[in-house]
């Protein structure tokens, strides 16, 4: 018969699993301290990731707004005809 994951039932009595590892209180305390340090580092990484994610969203929104403004400016320039030339300015430009 198999276990919940499809693994065969294995008992300690079968001699396959040997649970002779016994840890002292100091070893448990050291492991606990290391896990706390790892957890603290992971929290710091998560905070930095959240900050970067926020900055990227701000940059993306700024980029979208700049593109929208640029497109609007191009559309405005295409919609309005170029200014009429002043005959006096044309005469001064052709003189050499």
Swiss-Prot record:
Pfam families per UniProt: UPF0184
A molecular-function term among this protein's GO annotations: molecular adaptor activity
Signal peptide positions on this chain: none
Transmembrane segments: none
Superkingdom of origin: Eukaryota
Compartments, record wording: Cell junction; Cytoplasm, Cytoskeleton
A GO-annotated cellular component: cytoplasm
Protein name: Bublin coiled-coil protein
